[in-house]
Amino acid sequence: ILFIPDPNLGGYVAKQLPEKQFAFYHGGCPRHIVCSAADVAKARAAHPEALLLVHPECRPEVVEQADYVGSTTGIMAYAEKSDAKEFIIGTENSIVEHLSYVCPEKRFYPLAVQLTCMNMKLTTLMDIYHCLQGSGGEEIILPQDVMQGAGRCIRRMVELGG
């Protein structure tokens, strides 16, 4: 399996599928890869009662120390349902803000200060609204031969994937 774009997420998935062979592309989320074991130690020292919830795109040494590893949606659901009252969140900082809003009786701390993703902030609610209305964004029309070639590749990947 050629796993792109993130080798950290790919490695996490590969551990769950040991019967498969993986090749990883050297890319990754610039926010998640900045989290380090030192950040975990610092956050746990500052908040010893807090559970550590991280995204699997974090470095393996961070993921290995987590109390929960999951998607952004999974992290939010875990924190909302948990009886714990404090959490260290290892994903984009807007999740800390969201959880603080929906669970005001709980405390949420970012794993690292540099987890704000400016690229994610480029898309606004109005952008999404306009897109859903069909009036936003740029329409890209590909040549028929490009679409046919890409379609063959996609169909073959689906066939091989079972």
Q: Where are the language model's segments positioned?
A:
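The feature marks the mature, well-folded catalytic cores of soluble enzymes
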Residues: 1-162
